[in-house]
Curated annotation (Swiss-Prot):
Region: G4, residue numbers: 136-139
Assembly: Monomer.
Binding site for Mg(2+): 26
Segments forming domain tr-type G: 10-204
GO terms for MF: GTP binding; GTPase activity; translation elongation factor activity
Protein residues bound to GTP: 19-26, 81-85, 136-139
Keywords carried by this UniProt record: Cytoplasm, Elongation factor, GTP-binding, Hydrolase, Magnesium, Metal-binding, Nucleotide-binding, Protein biosynthesis
Name the record gives this protein: Elongation factor Tu
Protein task: GTP hydrolase that promotes the GTP-dependent binding of aminoacyl-tRNA to the A-site of ribosomes during protein biosynthesis.
Compartments it resides in: Cytoplasm
Organism encoding this protein: Amoebophilus asiaticus (strain 5a2)
Reaction catalysed by this enzyme: GTP + H2O = GDP + phosphate + H(+)
Region (G3): 81-84
Length: 395
């Protein structure tokens, strides 16, 4: 088979393997690299090199994650695999490794297990839009009817969490068989990746979304007006564009961008990822400060109450040593600033222990620009004790 060239111009997609411990996530990841390497589309990564995941820090939380890179004939993939269950929970809530889709691995020998359910729930809460299922270890099941039952169970579970359980592709295979070079099982990994190519859609690029920039600092330039600096989170800004300045309990302010500066050079535009200074017409420096956002008018609104999926750091991770209760009042760090808020626990939950993950409600003392999917850290006196993501706005 002719080798295909490694091509950076293919569309890029972030995916990951999710599922219960020991169902074969890491073995499958290794098998994908091995099968694709035969076509010159990947470097082989053995099980040990993926399993020995390096530590990363995201929003003050340590997470072990392995990043594996490979291509299919259509796309370039960055694939994340985590060694431990807690790493998955933290990863999905903090967005340390953004996933545009995921491969749910379920061992046909066991069927869906508690972490299978938890990972599907998290994927639906934190907006992993599409899943493809790999039923692993089918070579260890003698009765094909049992595999049918497991598939049915997985599809029902997906439907229970608002995924399209009837139409999600389910591929039956053996990751270990493919890793050992058995042609029957290598073909199943090829089939899996064809389905990932087809079923997991290309993500919308940040640059195509509505403009938003969190304000990090402001200064006034004599004779020219007020400049707000920050890193553009998404979208594009052009000189002459109208903008709205939102958040921190102030009135929404309207302005026009009269200049975009980057590294002391004047530009006509800035885009997602750029660190820029925006010159704002008719805005008093006193009225705008860190913690506000500058955005396309009417694209984001300020709120105080929300529901979030939260991970609470364990004592070993540098978190709290004791549980917290209803009406707990920490700081919530959004984008560039801390805002105090009060926690309301769900009915029947008396306390939250370090190491737990839970959905809870929060009411902030100030409004900030927020939307579903926005991530935050929970802090006490500057120390991170948890992380969360907004799953619903309540006011």
């Amino acid at each position: 088979m002719a080798k295909e060239t490694f091509d950076r111009s293919k569309p890029h997609v972030n995916i990951g393997t999710i599922g219960h411990v020991d169902h074969g996530k890491t073995t499958l990841t290794a098998a994908i690299t091995k099968v694709l390497s035969k076509r010159g589309l990947a470097q082989v990564r053995d099980f040990g090199s993926i399993d020995n995941a390096p530590e990363e820090r995201e929003r003050g939380i340590t997470i072990n994650t392995s990043h594996v890179e490979y291509e299919t004939s259509k796309r370039h993939y960055a694939h994340v695999d985590c060694p431990g269950h807690a790493d998955y929970v933290k990863n999905m809530i903090t967005g340390a490794a953004q996933m545009d889709g995921a491969i749910l691995v379920v061992a046909a020998t066991d069927g869906p297990m508690p972490q299978t359910r938890e990972h599907i729930l998290l994927a639906s809460q934190v907006g992993v839009p599409n899943l493809v299922v790999f039923l692993n270890k089918v070579d260890a099941v003698d009765d094909p009817e049992l595999v049918d039952l497991v598939e049915e169970e997985v599809r029902d579970l997906l439907k229970a969490y608002k995924f399209d359980g009837d139409n999600i592709p389910v591929i039956r295979g053996s990751a270990l068989g493919a890793l050992n070079g058995e042609p029957e099982w290598e073909a199943k990994v090829e089939e899996l990746m064809d389905n990932v190519d087809e079923y997991i859609p290309l993500p919308q690029r940040l640059i195509d979304r509505d403009f938003l920039m969190p304000v990090e600092d402001t200064m006034s330039i004599t004779g020219r007006g007020t400049v707000a600096t920050g890193r553009i989170e998404r979208g594009v800004i052009n000189v002459g564009d109208p903008v709205q300045i939102i958040g921190m309990g102030a009135q929404n302010l309207n302005s026009t961008v009269t200049g975009v500066e980057m590294f002391r050079k004047l530009l006509d535009r800035g885009e997602a990822g750029d660190n820029v200074g925006l010159l704002l017409r008719g805005i008093d420096k006193e009225k705008i400060h860190r913690g506000m956002v500058i955005c396309k008018p009417k694209s984001v609104t300020p709120h105080r109450k929300f529901k979030a999926e939260v991970y609470v750091l364990s004592k070993e991770e540098g978190g709290r040593h004791t549980p917290f209760f209803n009406k707990y009042r920490p700081q919530f760090y959004f984008r560039t600033t801390d805002v105090t808020g009060e926690v309301k626990l769900p009915a029947g939950v008396e306390m939250v222990m370090p190491g737990d993950n839970i959905a809870l409600e929060v009411e902030l003392i100030n409004e900030i620009a927020m939307e579903k999917g926005l991530r935050f850290a929970i802090r006490e006196g500057g120390r991170t004790v948890g992380a969360g993501q907004i799953i619903e706005i309540l006011d």
